[in-house]
Design a protein with these regions (language model features):
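Transmembrane helix-loop junctions in multipass membrane proteins, especially transporters and channels
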Residues: 25, 50-55, 83, 113, ...
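Short amphipathic alpha-helical coupling elements at transmembrane boundaries
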Residues: 77-88, 129-133, 209-216
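C-terminal transmembrane helix pair
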Residues: 2-5, 153-238
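Transmembrane alpha-helical segments of multi-pass membrane transport proteins and ion-pumping complexes
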Residues: 13-18, 39-43, 47, 93-97, ...
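Juxtamembrane loop-helix boundary motifs flanking transmembrane segments in multi-pass membrane proteins
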Residues: 67-82, 119, 170, 174, ...
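Transmembrane helical segments that form the transport core of multi-pass membrane transport proteins
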Residues: 84-170
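Long, contiguous bundles of hydrophobic transmembrane helices that form the permeation core
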Residues: 36-87
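Membrane-core helix-loop-helix motifs of multi-pass transport proteins
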Residues: 1-49, 206-228
């Protein structure tokens, strides 16, 4: 359950190394505001969706680098093991991301057989419309925001940012704020692949299977945190 909590919180994180790229494409003040708010809302959302109780016996601190006889592992041995482990982990993560993105593309192709405009993005956009409207937007703006939300969930935040970056300066301030805050997270199908891949390389099979069986909670947590953060910031920007 604790591993599932970590996985759920990972859906709402961003790495500091790419904040500069975000700020180049979107209003920087909302990007920087979204990061700490996402952290707080991730704690709230995971506590509601996956409450965990830990006994005093389980609440321990693990020592790293020590062996049973009290001697530490040689540095270069530790370095070699770390490089090997990281290499395997990267390959597992890349393979899982490719598989998840390919699965989303396959679903789009199958849906297009029934009706050309039908896609996973458009379906998620329709599902997200009531929530975007509840953020206090007019219907036409709420619809556009919902479509961007659907696109972000299927692809990633960079696709949406690249789409709107040329015009976002002309958006109403409220729409600009809620859109920027919503897309400032890793909540998408590709991240699901990263998380599953990471836990395959780090956790045992039982823990990994438990996380994989609750993958819906991961996506729900990411969406809920993004909506909570967008709603909170939107309250103060009109």
């Amino acid at each position: 359950e604790r591993n599932l909590t970590l996985a759920m919180m990972s859906m709402s994180c961003v790495t500091a190394s790419i904040l500069g790229a975000y700020i180049e494409m979107m209003p920087g003040q909302y990007i920087l505001t979204a990061v700490p708010i996402n952290i707080i809302n991730a704690l709230i959302a995971t506590s509601m969706l996956n409450p965990v109780s830990i006994s005093a016996e389980e609440d321990t601190i693990e020592k790293v680098g020590a062996t049973d006889n009290g001697k530490k592992e040689p540095f270069f041995s530790f370095l070699g093991d770390s490089i090997l482990g990281a290499g395997k982990l990267i390959l597992i993560i890349v393979a899982n991301v490719v598989a998840f993105v390919a699965l989303a593309a396959l679903i789009d192709k199958v849906l297009a057989l029934f009706w050309k405009p039908l896609s996973l993005e458009s379906i998620l956009g329709v599902i997200m419309f009531p929530f975007s409207w509840l953020l206090g937007l007019p219907v036409n703006q709420a619809w556009d925001l919902a479509q961007n939300m659907g696109m972000k969930l299927v692809t990633n935040e960079f696709v949406v940012m690249g789409k709107v970056t040329a015009d976002i300066a002309h958006y109403p301030e409220h729409l600009k704020a809620v859109l920027t805050v919503f897309v400032t997270s890793f909540a998408n199908f590709g991240t699901l692949g990263m998380i599953i891949g990471a836990f395959k390389g780090l956790a045992n099979k039982e823990d990994n299977d438990y996380i994989a069986s609750n993958i819906g909670y991961l996506l729900l947590s990411g969406i809920l945190v993004s909506l909570l953060s967008a709603a909170f910031v939107g309250l103060f920007v009109w």
